[in-house]
């Protein structure tokens, strides 16, 4: 398996994997449309300064990806932060170190960019993801709350 930066030629496959991520997360969030299909989401972000799209290939097939970006509010934040926005590993490749490898590479990108931390959001009932992030030294520091209206 090979980890590398995404190229424009990878954009359609990354959209497919993001679609799968949304479908997976729909089981934890009733407001997610489990039949939604992502199109043209990543093409413009590949190579964009402050954005990182990483992927893992196995025999030429993209089987996992991570998308993250740098976030800064001058004057409000003492240092910029990195946001880990999306992480997906094909089911057959889970629990084989792919997610850890992607996060490690993103951590290096973030550190080289001078950020003070990486932040992410995870659905509170997604125990598998919570366990992964805790194992990789992420800690709960904020709580996001929602109020259902309908």
Can you name each region flagged by the protein language model?
Residues 1, 60-65, 82:
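Glycine-rich phosphate/pyrophosphate-binding loop shared by adenosine-nucleotide-utilizing enzymes
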Residues 2-16:
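A short beta-loop-alpha structural element at the N-terminal edge
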Residues 22-42:
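Conserved GNAT-fold acetyl-CoA-binding loop/helix
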Residues 44-55, 83:
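A short helix-loop-beta-strand connector motif used in the catalytic cores of GNAT acetyltransferases and
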Residues 55, 61-70, 88:
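Conserved beta-strand in the GNAT
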Residues 86-89, 95-108, 131, 135:
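Conserved acetyl-CoA-binding loop-helix of GNAT-fold acetyltransferases
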Residues 110-121:
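Conserved GNAT acetyl-CoA-binding A-motif
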Residues 119-129, 146-150:
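Conserved beta-strand-loop-alpha-helix junction that forms the acyl-donor binding cleft
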């Amino acid at each position: 398996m090979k980890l590398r930066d995404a190229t424009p030629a990878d954009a359609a496959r990354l959209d497919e994997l993001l679609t799968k991520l949304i479908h997976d997360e729909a089981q934890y969030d009733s407001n997610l449309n489990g039949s939604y299909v992502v199109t043209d989401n990543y093409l413009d972000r590949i190579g964009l300064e402050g954005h990182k799209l990483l992927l893992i290939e196995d025999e030429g097939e993209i089987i996992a990806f991570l998308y993250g970006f740098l976030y800064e509010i001058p004057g409000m934040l003492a240092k910029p932060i990195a946001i880990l926005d999306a992480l997906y590993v094909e089911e057959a490749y889970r629990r084989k170190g792919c997610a850890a490898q992607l996060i490690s590479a993103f951590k290096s990108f973030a550190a080289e960019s001078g950020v003070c931390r990486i932040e992410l959001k995870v659905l509170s009932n997604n125990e598998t993801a919570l366990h992964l992030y805790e194992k990789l030294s992420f800690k709960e520091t904020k709580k996001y709350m929602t109020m259902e209206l309908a």
